[in-house]
Amino acid sequence: MAVSCRLLVVSLSFFLPTVLAPSLPAQQHTDTSGQYPAELLSGLHWRDVGPMRGGRTYAVAGNADQPDTFYMGSVGGGVWKTENAGRTWFPIADEGIPIGSIGAIAVAPSDPNVIYVGTGEPDIRSQHSYGIGVFKSTDAGKTWKHIGLEETRQIGRIVVDPKNPNRVYVAALGHVYKANPERGIYRSTDGGAHWKKVLFKANDPENVGAVDLAIDPKDPRVLYASLWATRRPPWSVYAPSNMAGGGLYKSTDGGDTWKQLAGGLPTDDFVGKIGVAVAPSNPNRVWAVVDDLGAAVARPIRGGPPAAGREHETGGGVYVSDDAGATWQRVNSEQRLWSRGWYFESIAVDPVNPDRAYVINTATYMTTDGGKTFVPVKGAPGGDDYHQLWVNPKDGNRMVLSSDQGTVISVDGAKTWSTWYNQPTAQIYHVAADNRFPYWLYGAQQDSGGVGVSTWSRQGVLSFRNWEPTCLAGESNTVVPDPKDGNILYGGGDGRCDQALNLPAPLGGELPAADPNDPARRTWTLPQVFSLADEALYYSNQFVFRSRDRGRSWEKISPDLARLHPEVPKTLDAATAKDIDQPMTDRFGVVYSIGPSPIDAKTVWVGTDDGLIHVTRDDGANWKEVTPPAMTAWSKVSQIEASHFDVETAYASIDRHRLADNMPYIYRTHDGGKTWQNVVKGIPEGAFVNSVKEDPKQKGLLYAATELRVYVSFNDGDQWQPLQNNMPVTSVRDIVVHGDDLAIATYGRGFWLMDQMTALRQLAVKGSQIESEAAYLFVPGETYAIHNGSMNGTPLPHEEAQELNPPAGVLAYYWLKSAPSQPIKLELIDASGAAKACVASDTPVKPVDTEAINVQAIWEQPTLPPSASTGMHRIALNVVPPRGFGRRGPVTPPPADACHPAGSLPPAQEESQARRGRGGPAGLQPGEYTVRLTVDGKTYTQPVTIHPDPRNLSQGADAALGGEDDDL
């Protein structure tokens, strides 16, 4: 088939009863004085650029009466739903649940419209996010209401009485980093209007929480609940601590009274997490998977099983009771089923066969002989790490399974599974951009490894074709492209490789050997960064290293910059605090962030994860500590940013959530670190800061990546306001400014990109003036004429996971202080004064005539005219319309040209105009243009240059370029 090539203009760049009433999320309270109105930023738009690869999920549920309907809760990406057994997924709580971390989902069996969601994941790895209580929907996820338990923080399970949707139980784990009383099993009998704590550890209520629950489907007065005492010190990288107090409990009166179960179960001080399930076909059969390493086991500091060859007695394994929990037998002690229990320990039972059960670990294991033997039914060589399985109580062949790679569904009894390559819920730690055109974004995805995504696709949409795993970097390291060759990638601690060839690029040298008395330390993520001043490459552990030959050789340029004897936080319990006396010694800190000065190659700022800031002014020969006095040990310097305009200025984002402090902290210095100010007005509690970046082109314009959303400051941090707009609430981990684009890495929704954010720069210069104007046209950003090859072959089915290309055309932003009395018009004028493109707000939108087309209506979506409502808006001006087909639908040719209505041109020109609207003749050529906005008879203009495609040196000289009959 002939493949047309059109020229498009694209802008890239838990017996004391406690009654609790619902409370509101605290993070809603903050000082917003001095902010610009949200309408002044409303036209700025975020674009999801993938990758189309699922991220870590924990909570899953289904609707027994609608067998193709399932729900999943991403640990950072919110609540999602499928109505076609996993063929496609869509988010259902982005506007109803203001937190991305989901720990539990339960659908009421007697009324599937009632859904309860518990926020805050219970798999409390070192990188996790908190919750803000329980939410409820009564319309199958369309709308949501917060119903309390905000301070429970992490919720492991919710169960609903099978006969009464208003009787619900919640297993609350509590705060991870401090003691708090909101732990245990909570019950509501009025649908969440009020809560009563019905199970907790009376002798230690502030440290022992609840993590799992099971209900007898035939007698809902019978419940089983597991208690778990756990905590994390701020230096912990892997397993959390286990404290005394855990165990399995049973109630036979709907939660009024409870009894601890023993009769063969471990009851020592080393009992960890326990998963429990009741066989629906025989409720006397109860299953449990128990984490218990035993008193004789020496626990390594990083967690995991005991050292090889060490004699020990453990209580871990799979247990079965055939008398409703009175007595238990350990039927299987294989460590593959229960090891690393803090991260797993979940079990599910077939609804018909009580001997058929599933245990969840690095693989999903099935037994059909009552637990004697298990075989994996889902798992890959890398160890996918699975978490929860929901089995349809009316059809045991249908199930939904969560994992570190996303959520999958089986409709044939675990023989085959749906894909997780249709869930844009990746957890990305950092973001970097290369200098190719179009450019790529890079980062490390938790549990899946390094990933690169293209920000533009010649197919018109971003799909599986436009991202790829990187040739290096594990799940947590930085991925940094070479500034001169985007194919060469560097992975923090992993070396260097050629992405195009998928081959390692020899380094020729290694990091200098560590001092045997001070061995190299590391944490989950370590920084690696190129200096913008001289392209030196920096890397760190407790030392800072530099390479001037792109990693072929390295020199250590600092002493150990972490604290010598960091204090133990007062928020820790005594047992967890002892963790600091491990054989590794009390040295845990590392240099967590590096900020080379973009304007002085000899100046480098660094911050540690245990709360210190240093700076060198002489290439690393000498280092000076310049830590703000208010900072204490274990205040993690999550990012330090050297100013692009002043060598004495730097910004440091400080994360203290590991000290149970969720307040935001951004320190600013203008005198080389002598004095610091905490500049966070406008950022609420809960939004602790993961990164702060300065705009490289506009002094005083700052961006902050927080645990809840992105914030922007137009006045050097004195005042902040949300830059959320259409982006869902999620943990934002990193930011990079690339040309005129703003890219972020999120911990639950992958990479997001704001195309052409130049309006932010203009607001930083004269925002108050713009706000006061009746209308204002912003200066467009850099724009390029690029070839957009149409589909080569049939388009991807719309069910395939896809996201949109950047808008095609000159991206015009405009502000209307109030709605004008007349229609507005925007034009693109060439150097001769001719209008090459024009759109008007009164252009009627012609609905798709489904009786006259030969494709589904999803393939023919009308283009909307520019808005004339109050606020900031954007519109893409282009002669040739985009021809992309995305999940949100494509766009058809634009409406009748507002500059030249039908019938106003000579016949030949009329035909040409019509053909052009169908993607006909040549699009906009490179050159100088003017954007003109007309509002109530007044015109506003701004210049724009359309640059040639950097990949096409002959562009501009070829007059026929972009013709409708061009073939490839």
Regions found by a protein language model. Give the residues of each.
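Beta-strand-rich binding/interaction modules
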Residues: 812-813, 820-839, 928-932
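Glycine-centered tight-turn motifs at strand-turn-strand junctions
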Residues: 835-922
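Aromatic/hydrophobic beta-strand junction motif of beta-rich domains
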Residues: 276, 812-818, 877-879
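Bacterial N-terminal signal peptides
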Residues: 8-21
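Beta-propeller blade termini and top-face loops
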Residues: 27-800, 807-813, 841-844, 851-853
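Boundary at the C-terminal end of the N-terminal hydrophobic targeting segment
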Residues: 22-26
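Extended, polar beta-sheet/loop recognition surfaces of beta-rich domains
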Residues: 768-795, 936-968
